[in-house]
């Protein structure tokens, strides 16, 4: 779909060529452009070798694009999927010149020997860790795979990075790590725990950046809704009251780079995601962008919450809200550190690994033992499919929702 850049042209006859522009996910978020301290970002990227895991993905590729603006000595694009990574490398060479120092490396974070080989060969100074299994319902069906990749892949990467003298490690986290109801979010919470553990016990500066949904990324709602509209509908949403925090891909990547420059090791940085967006409103607006009218000539169908899904996400725990601290950037806050019993944590990790390697449903119980705030919204059926355990028919208490959202917004304002 294309938008008319100047609505006044509607009354002046046929718009001229160039009067239209492509739909941008930012059209759905009414807020100012992110302001960056580029000197701070340059200070740790310029002239350095930078490794981006998951570099061919939506966020990883945008990180690579923006890192190139700061003239790194070398950019390493690490991904298990060769096609997207190769296309990104070609894009960067077309933009910056065929002789730029960009290397595409194929491998898995689950393969520690491959990681050691990469670190020994290229000696990166900075690591951005964007590789992960992120699809919430799919990870409910394959919880052991989520654990192997997200938890132990991250542990492999942290271990190899620390052993090979990496200066700075930036982990991409998610609001789904807060009071998780799904396996993916729970694994990301454990990754935050790993970050703080390595920050405390190694010389490497480690930090995580927690943010919400990214508009336009693989599997996000706008591409899904667009495809459904092009196919004649229906447009499907899981619950009429479901809300989410959103950022555009460039916004998220810019703030990740900025948070990486703050360099307070062990920090969990929380991004100000602005006001939450009701998914029903998003679907309605997009349907109208395409010239249809919701539930007149384009049906909106409510399908019920998917396994692991919840009605609204939170950017911080209740225990974090009163202790959030501000940073030099007005859109980045710091969550208070977790108290982690190192011996108990590593014992729980061993138990989790055992369950994951046996593809045991017991992995979900192990996750619950490790993350006390994890309350799974899943039930395994007799045919081995997984369904949401609750929430499909309930109506959200709008007063409670608004109270929760107001408290989060107030906390961010107070921190400023």
Model-assigned labels for residue ranges:
Residues 79-84:
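Helix N-cap at the beta1-alpha1 junction of Rossmann-like dinucleotide-binding domains, i.e.
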Residues 104, 146, 206-209:
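Hydrophobic/aromatic anchor residues within beta-strands of the central parallel beta-sheet
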Residues 105-126:
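Conserved Rossmann-fold cofactor-binding substructure of NAD(P)-dependent oxidoreductases
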């Amino acid at each position: 779909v294309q938008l008319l850049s100047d609505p006044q042209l509607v009354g002046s006859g046929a718009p001229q060529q160039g009067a239209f522009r492509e739909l941008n996910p930012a059209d759905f978020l009414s807020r100012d452009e992110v302001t960056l301290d580029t000197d701070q970002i340059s200070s740790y990227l310029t002239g350095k070798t930078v490794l981006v895991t998951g570099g061919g993905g939506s966020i990883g590729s945008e990180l690579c694009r923006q890192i190139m603006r700061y003239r790194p000595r070398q950019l390493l694009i690490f991904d298990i999927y060769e096609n997207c990574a190769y296309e990104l490398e070609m894009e960067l060479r077309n933009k910056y010149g065929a002789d730029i120092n960009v290397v595409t490396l194929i491998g898995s974070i689950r393969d520690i020997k491959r990681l050691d080989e990469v670190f020994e060969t290229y000696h990166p100074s900075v690591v951005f860790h964007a590789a992960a299994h992120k699809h919430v319902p799919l990870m409910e069906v394959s919880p052991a795979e989520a654990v192997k990749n997200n938890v132990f892949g991250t542990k492999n990467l942290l271990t190899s990075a620390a052993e090979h003298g990496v200066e700075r490690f930036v982990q991409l986290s998610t609001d789904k790590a807060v009071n998780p109801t799904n396996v993916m979010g729970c694994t990301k919470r454990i990754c935050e725990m790993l970050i703080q553990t390595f920050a405390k016990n190694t010389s490497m500066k480690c930090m995580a950046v927690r943010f919400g949904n990214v508009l336009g990324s693989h599997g996000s709602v706008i591409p899904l809704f667009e495809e459904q509209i092009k196919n004649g509908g229906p447009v499907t949403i899981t619950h009429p009251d479901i809300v989410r925090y959103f950022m555009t891909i460039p916004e998220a990547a810019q703030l990740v780079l900025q948070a990486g420059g703050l360099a307070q090791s062990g920090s969990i940085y929380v991004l100000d995601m602005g006001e939450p967006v009701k998914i029903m409103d998003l679907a309605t607006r997009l349907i109208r962008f395409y010239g249809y009218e919701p539930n007149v000539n384009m049906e909106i169908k409510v399908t019920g919450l998917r396994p692991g899904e919840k009605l609204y996400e939170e950017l911080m725990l209740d225990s974090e809200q009163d202790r959030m601290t501000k940073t030099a950037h007005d859109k980045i806050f710091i969550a208070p550190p977790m108290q982690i019993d190192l011996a108990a944590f590593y014992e729980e990790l061993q138990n989790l690994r055992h369950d994951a390697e046996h593809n045991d449903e017991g992995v979900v119980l192990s996750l619950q033992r490790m993350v006390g705030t994890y309350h799974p919204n899943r039930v395994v059926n007799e045919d081995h499919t997984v369904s949401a355990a609750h929430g499909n028919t309930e109506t959200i208490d709008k007063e409670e929702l608004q109270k929760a959202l107001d408290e989060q917004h107030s906390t961010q304002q107070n921190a400023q």
